[in-house]
C-alpha cells in the first residue's frame, strides 16, 4: 500500500509500506493492505511504518529504526489526521 506523510513544511515520506501503526485518539491502530476506508484523527505519538527499508535517503533521515522490532521505522507527531482508501493513505500531521 502507498502512504504519504505531510507536514506543513514538507513531505516526510511517500512510498510503499507493508502496514502502518498510528496513534489514534482512542489508542494505537494498525492499517494493513485492503483495509476499509477510514478517516481518523491522530494524537501525539509515533507513526510506525512497517517496511523492509526506507530507500529514499531524503525520507529516511526523518525516521528512527525501532530496535525491538525488525522493519519498523518511527516518526514522532504532535497530532494530525489520516485518510485511507483503496490501499492509499495520506497522513497530515505536525
Predicted feature locations:
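Compact, glycine-rich, soluble single-domain proteins
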Residues: 2-94
Amino acid at each position: 500500500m502507498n502512504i504519504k506523510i505531510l507536514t506543513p513544511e514538507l513531505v516526510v515520506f511517500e512510498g510503499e509500506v507493508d502496514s502502518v501503526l498510528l496513534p489514534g485518539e482512542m489508542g494505537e491502530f494498525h492499517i494493513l493492505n485492503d483495509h476499509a476506508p477510514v478517516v481518523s484523527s491522530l494524537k501525539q505519538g509515533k507513526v510506525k511504518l512497517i517496511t523492509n527499508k526506507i530507500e529514499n535517503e531524503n525520507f529516511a533521515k526523518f525516521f528512527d529504526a525501532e530496535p525491538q522490532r525488525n522493519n519498523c521505522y518511527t516518526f514522532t507527531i504532535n497530532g494530525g489526521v489520516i485518510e485511507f482508501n483503496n490501499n492509499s493513505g495520506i497522513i497530515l500531521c505536525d
